[in-house]
Amino acid sequence: ESIDLVGKVKKEDLFTFHKEQYGLGSIKIAAAGDVSPADFNSQIFEAIGDWSIKEVEIPKLTEKAREPKEGSEIIKVQDKTSSDLYIGQPIGIDREHEDYYALMLGIYILGGNFSARLMQTVRDKQGLTYGIGSSISGVSFGADGYWNIWGTFSPDILKKGIEATKEQVDLWFNKGITEDELSAKKTTISGSYKVSMDSTAGLAAKILSNAEHGRELSYLDEYPKIIESISLSEVNSAIKKYVNPNKLYMVAAGTL
């Protein structure tokens, strides 16, 4: 369907979109470094000052996430040496929800990096996957998001990989995370966040992202404090509230 829609786009459609959507009024520009605000503004308006002033109305998302349901799909792709697996479900909240950070931390502990549970067990201990992880997606600009697990497996051990992955999800859901895990991942997330701003490009990108999401400049300093403030009970409660291991949807693709 997406391929068909892209194929129908004409050159005139692009010109029309640019004319209707591009202009001053809604544009946001960020810069970081040895920059004079006065000189910067002067150069910007010299470059695009003749653009018309347009306030682009971004439609509010009103459609809510569907209720989670158990299901599976197999997509057969010939001559593939590996198979890809996605498991997930909607969470029904966006990034501004009060439970977002707690749930994000819980899912990061499950599969957010190389030292997370899924990589340590399904990959390193059991040797069943080339790579596996979990994350929250689709939560920006008021959208109800979802959480998912992804993994890459040899087709002949995909079934074992699925079983091992679900075993870790059940353990994570039923037993929760530990204080040591939470402390370690808080350090990782806050550290990565700070490192991402160690260049002028990274700092400008963060400032622009915050502006696009309607956040104040102070959020640059607030984010690590928010992460640090999340308690163990908040994370484990969020996992119980927004995850249902009995209603996961699974899609696998490959030579199966």
Residues of each region from the PLM?
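Short amphipathic alpha-helices in soluble, non-transmembrane regions
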Residues: 41-48, 162-168
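Non-catalytic beta-strand/loop surface segments
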Residues: 1-25, 50-97, 108-159, 181, ...
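Acidic/histidine-enriched alpha-helical segments
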Residues: 36, 55-69, 123, 139-140, ...
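Helix N-cap motif at beta-to-alpha junctions
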Residues: 33-38, 154-158, 255-256
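Bacterial peptidoglycan biogenesis and beta-lactam-recognition machinery
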Residues: 36-38, 47-54
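C-terminal regions of mature proteins
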Residues: 28-33, 98, 180-256
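Amphipathic alpha-helical interaction elements
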Residues: 19, 32, 107-111, 170, ...
